[in-house]
């Protein structure tokens, strides 16, 4: 199937699954409005890539079909993400006295600062989600942003939110494969990615495309999901944690930090900053919203968010969705999605506690001025 045929098929399926006007619906309201047959198909498309096998053959199968796996993943989890997390699909560090939304915005602004994004810059957001970080960074810097995404549903939502918050003149969102970008070479002043390039089957592939479209002298800043130097691929417990993260987060293979850093160098980048922001011995761990530890909640406004994302909140949601699915209110497959997300949460927390995994390894890399 050609690239254009794949895009057309995905667009048609997205319309069938989510329906008209889906961009304005969020959370469980959006979930309950799905076409039931299409939802079942979407879940099957995603879960067929994860059958409990961690051998190389199963891994290679996921790597080969990364585009469809990622598209299917975000078709089925976007509503759950918005319900539990908001419109910025990433983790962050937390400081004492800082509420959840402030921490998320600061995390995004810090990346923009490290990338040197300034007013008037044309910036590419690789794997933009529903545009939460793009809106924050555009307001923070005054730059103009193009968001790249392979999921039609998320693009619809990102455009809807940009217009809703009167930012449509500062940003646009386009469909594309980050392993095969269609932008002109040397187009962007800066590029950033927030917990998105981990979906790539090969990091040199996505980093090479970023290098191509970035202007000489331009900067690429990324929060990368990687397994740390403590991770041992031959350790069964370590591999189980990595697999739980892969299954619940639509990732064909979790790479190590050394692989990521070398991939940047291999495509021509000069790596200026290489730092794990999760390894700062913070009093409040980055994974606290998933743990159920109320002692870390910083404000009254965080209570609802924390409950939805905590262990007990996730169990409540799973139970509620299970009942709705049984009585025919929620589409078939919804419970399987919540189960996959629960597996991911367990793996993320365990990986974080044992310092095997980080969702915020910061790389700041420069394309040489004399790059051709």
Curated annotation (Swiss-Prot):
Coiled-coil blocks: none
UniProt biased composition (Basic and acidic residues): 1-23
EC number from the UniProt entry: 2.1.1.41
GO molecular function, one term: identical protein binding
Key words, A-Z: Lipid biosynthesis, Lipid metabolism, Methyltransferase, S-adenosyl-L-methionine, Steroid biosynthesis, Steroid metabolism, Sterol biosynthesis, Sterol metabolism, Transferase
Highest taxon above the source species: Eukaryota
Record field: catalytic activity: zymosterol + S-adenosyl-L-methionine = fecosterol + S-adenosyl-L-homocysteine + H(+)
GO biological process: cellular response to xenobiotic stimulus; ergosterol biosynthetic process; methylation; plasma membrane raft polarization
Biological or metabolic pathway of the protein: Steroid metabolism; ergosterol biosynthesis; ergosterol from zymosterol: step 1/5
GO cellular component, one term: lipid droplet
Top EC group: transferase
Stored InterPro entries: Erg6_SMT_methyltransf, Methyltransf_11, MeTrfase_SMT, SAM-dependent_MTases_sf, Sterol_MeTrfase_C
Region (Disordered) location: 1-28
Family according to the record: Belongs to the class I-like SAM-binding methyltransferase superfamily. Erg6/SMT family.
Protein name in UniProt: Sterol 24-C-methyltransferase
Organism field: Candida glabrata (strain ATCC 2001 / BCRC 20586 / JCM 3761 / NBRC 0622 / NRRL Y-65 / CBS 138)
Source species taxonomy: Eukaryota, Fungi, Dikarya, Ascomycota, Saccharomycotina
């Amino acid at each position: 199937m050609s690239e254009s045929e794949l895009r057309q098929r995905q667009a048609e399926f997205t319309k069938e699954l989510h329906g008209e006007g889906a961009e304005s619906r969020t959370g469980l309201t959006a979930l309950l409005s799905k076409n039931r047959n299409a939802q079942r198909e979407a879940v099957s498309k995603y879960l067929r890539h994860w059958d409990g096998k961690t051998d190389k053959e199963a891994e290679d199968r996921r790597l080969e079909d990364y585009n469809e796996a990622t598209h299917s993943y975000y078709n089925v989890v976007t509503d759950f993400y918005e319900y539990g997390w908001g419109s910025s699909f990433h983790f962050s560090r937390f400081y004492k006295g800082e509420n959840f939304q402030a921490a998320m915005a600061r995390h995004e602004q810090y990346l923009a600062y490290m990338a040197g994004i300034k007013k008037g810059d044309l910036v590419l957001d690789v794997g933009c989600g529903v545009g939460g970080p793009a809106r924050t960074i555009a307001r923070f810097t005054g730059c103009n942003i193009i968001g790249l995404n392979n999921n039609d549903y998320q693009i619809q939502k990102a455009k809807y939110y940009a217009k809703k918050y009167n930012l449509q003149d500062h940003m646009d969102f386009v469909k594309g494969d980050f392993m095969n970008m269609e932008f002109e070479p040397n187009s962007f002043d800066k590029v950033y990615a927030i917990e998105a390039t981990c979906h790539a089957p090969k990091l040199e592939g996505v980093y090479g495309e970023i290098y191509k479209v970035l202007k000489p002298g331009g900067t690429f800043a990324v929060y990368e999901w990687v397994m740390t130097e403590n991770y041992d691929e031959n350790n069964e417990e370590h591999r189980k944690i990595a697999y739980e993260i892969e299954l619940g987060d639509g990732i064909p293979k979790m790479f190590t930090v050394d692989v990521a850093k070398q991939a940047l160098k291999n495509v021509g980048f000069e790596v200026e900053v290489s730092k794990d922001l999760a390894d700062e011995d913070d009093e409040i761990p980055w994974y606290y919203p998933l743990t159920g530890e109320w002692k870390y909640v910083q404000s009254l406004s965080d209570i609802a968010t924390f409950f939805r994302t905590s262990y007990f909140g996730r169990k409540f949601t799973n139970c509620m969705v299970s009942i709705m699915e049984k009585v025919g209110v929620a589409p078939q497959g919804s419970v399987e999605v919540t189960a996959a997300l629960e597996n991911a949460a367990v793996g993320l927390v365990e990986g974080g506690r044992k310092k095997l995994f980080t969702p915020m390894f910061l790389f700041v890399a420069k394309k040489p001025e004399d790059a051709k």
